[in-house]
């Protein structure tokens, strides 16, 4: 009995030691003001592509960040800037990256156009690696007009289960889905014959994101004003890519003791696992400048019915882990 108790005590000490040495990412993930992060995994490496958070006239480039364990992040500076895009002048926002045939395509918004009479919208950059450098793929915007009331910003590239690519985008409380050509040189009609199909759910403002889990389409978006404390993330679930998407509820929002304006997110799934992470931006307590936003990460979990559990924002972030 004495030997058994000694073994239990030793085991508790070992477990305690392992727990105390567990490394966490911490929040924010990396220094600097950044927003609208898209997180993904390429070749066993975590990548985050954010907006540089600054006045519009200073938003003329993108940085990217990579990590092999979610805790140590390397910054890749100016993977793309307005010097590589003749028609882009300012407000380069919300990069979304997809790999296709050995190339990496970065979709972005530029110029914050307010009408069809202005130059700007959603463009595409192309590179040989995730860290770029990216060059303009089309020499013009892919989408440069308002369709169904949607401002051409906040683009997210979505790959369906059959390998087809779609672009889900839109500001001004309207969201569209379009089908991309295989070579990404333009769009083509959806199955119903339309080019721009509106899929706007109740409460939608901007920042769409979609993923598939157990055959269901999870559509997520940001609500509220991006400069205010009420900015948050909500979601819907559907059996179809094009909906209908009936709002389930909020999944991420502010904690007044930590930060406000928690929104414009993306989701990372560890390949081959059921481990999900939500990557988002928030404004730390004490910061009143609208551009003082930082990139953070939390674990995202589901209940037995497949609904997303509410996510609490933290200062600790998530434990270190590999993507392989």
What do these predicted regions represent?
Residues 1-4:
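Positively charged n-region of N-terminal signal peptides that target proteins for export
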Residues 6-16:
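Bacterial N-terminal signal peptides
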Residues 18-324:
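Carbohydrate-active catalytic/glycan-binding domains of CAZyme proteins
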């Amino acid at each position: 009995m004495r030997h058994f108790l000694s073994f239990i005590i030793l085991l508790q000490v070992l477990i305690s030691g392992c727990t105390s040495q567990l490394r966490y990412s911490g929040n924010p993930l990396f220094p600097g003001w950044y927003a609208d992060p898209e997180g993904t995994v390429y070749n066993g490496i975590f990548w985050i592509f954010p907006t540089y958070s600054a006045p519009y006239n200073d938003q003329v480039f993108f940085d990217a960040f990579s990590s092999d364990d979610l805790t140590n992040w390397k910054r890749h500076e100016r993977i793309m800037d307005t010097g590589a895009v003749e028609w882009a002048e300012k407000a380069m926002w919300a990069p979304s990256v997809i790999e296709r045939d050995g190339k990496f395509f970065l979709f972005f918004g530029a110029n914050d156009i307010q009408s069809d009479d202005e130059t700007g919208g959603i463009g595409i950059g192309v590179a040989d690696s995730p860290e770029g450098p990216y060059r303009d793929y089309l020499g013009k915007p892919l989408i440069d007009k308002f369709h169904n009331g949607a401002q051409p910003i906040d683009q997210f590239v979505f790959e369906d289960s059959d390998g087809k690519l779609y672009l889900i985008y839109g500001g001004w409380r309207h969201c569209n889905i379009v089908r991309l050509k295989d070579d990404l040189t333009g769009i083509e009609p959806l199955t119903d014959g339309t080019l721009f199909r509106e899929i706007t759910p109740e409460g939608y403002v901007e920042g769409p994101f979609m993923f598939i889990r157990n055959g269901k389409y999870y559509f997520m978006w940001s609500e509220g004003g991006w400069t205010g404390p009420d900015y948050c993330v909500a979601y819907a679930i559907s059996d179809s890519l094009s909906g209908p998407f009936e709002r389930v509820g909020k999944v991420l929002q502010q904690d007044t003791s930590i930060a406000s304006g928690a929104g414009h997110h993306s989701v990372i799934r560890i390949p081959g696992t059921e481990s999900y992470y939500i990557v988002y931006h928030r404004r730390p307590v004490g910061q009143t400048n609208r551009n003082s936003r930082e990139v953070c990460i939390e674990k995202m979990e589901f209940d037995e019915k497949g609904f997303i559990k509410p996510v609490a924002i933290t200062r600790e972030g998530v434990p270190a882990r590999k993507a392989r």
